[in-house]
Amino acid sequence: MAVQDVIEALKKETLEDVGINQNLAQLVKDIKMVGNVLTIVFEPPKQGLEDIIRAKVIDALGNLPEVQKIDVKFVKPQAQIPVKQQAPQQQQTPPPQTQQPMFTRKKVPGVKHIIAVGSGKGGVGKSTVAANLAVALSQLGYKVGLLDADVYGPSVPTLFGLKGERVTVDQFQRIIPVEKYGLKILSIGFMLPSEDTPIIWRGPMLMKALTEFLFSTKWGNLDFLVMDLPPGTGDVQITLAQNVELTGAVVVTTPQDVALADVKKAVSMFREVNIPVLGVIENMAYFICPSDKQKYYIFGKGKVAEFANAYGLKILGSIPIDPEVAEKSDKGEPIVISHPDSEVAKAFLSIAKVLSQVVESKVN
């Protein structure tokens, strides 16, 4: 295989999606082919782009028949040599200082929009909402992935009937997500010996795992990657805020005061770390009586609307209580799949439409 073939392939991969007007061929410092192992050394324009460049290289060259392994290496970006300037003849007013970011947020290659689904507390149905929202987006014709980032309580394997499923990797050590119901799915639960195995990780371990899930997974081209976050405002949320370019967050709550008190903290946290809050989903909003078809607001009515108005948020939709949701979830069948004509499924499809419109308006 000629070096020129590699260079030509790398010319087609650019860094324009991270605001840098260069292609990968311009960053190459060395190329070697020993047997069927291709080694390429890059000098990135700045630090923090290594995972993105590595993923783009594998996408560009991974299908070459002569190559069985690609080893991507990096040298540190060369520091700019300061230019000596003459002292000004008269004192000048310095230009206003702009605050430099303390971290670099990176895009996941091939993924247009990353939507984080969070909540202030557990028990509000966040994971069920994230799972059915992902399925609903897929049914609208979007290419969708679902990442179970709820590392302390991964429930996606149960919700999709994937208990005991194990992840595999390709020849380039990229994680291959599991596919079901038209989604590409990845969960920490796929990597545990059993569903009873606890995850006892500190912040650095969480950061490493999430980074691997996002940037070392073969997601392909996705319109949406839905992330099911753990409840609260802990290490996972901070890691994402510092390292990943999210389109925004969706918060899930129930109408109870105790849930609303905690979801306010979640909204404040997202805003504190400059993650846009795209809207609120009200779960368990009401119960439809089978006999008279009337709506009964078991946990009260109007509280979520008051909260949304106070915080300047959009209500994406309200989901009724339905015993079928829990029953089918335990069997690994999202309600949008098992009962597409139910009020709950219709609510999820409506929310997916509204969310996609919110995202498009934000982008435009």
From Swiss-Prot:
One of its GO terms (molecular function) is ATP hydrolysis activity. It comes from the Bacteria. Residues 83-92 have a biased composition (Low complexity). Keywords: ATP-binding, Hydrolase, Iron, Iron-sulfur, Metal-binding, Nucleotide-binding. The keyword Cell cycle does not apply. InterPro entries: Mrp-like_CS, Mrp/NBP35_ATP-bd, NUBPL-like, P-loop_NTPase, YlxH/NBP35. ATP binds at G120, K121, G122, G123, V124, G125, K126, S127. PROSITE patterns: MRP. One of its GO terms (biological process) is iron-sulfur cluster assembly. Residues 83-102 are annotated as: Disordered. The keyword Iron applies. Homodimer. Belongs to the Mrp/NBP35 ATP-binding proteins family. Binds and transfers iron-sulfur (Fe-S) clusters to target apoproteins. Can hydrolyze ATP. This is Iron-sulfur cluster carrier protein. It comes from Aquifex aeolicus (strain VF5). The gene is mrp.
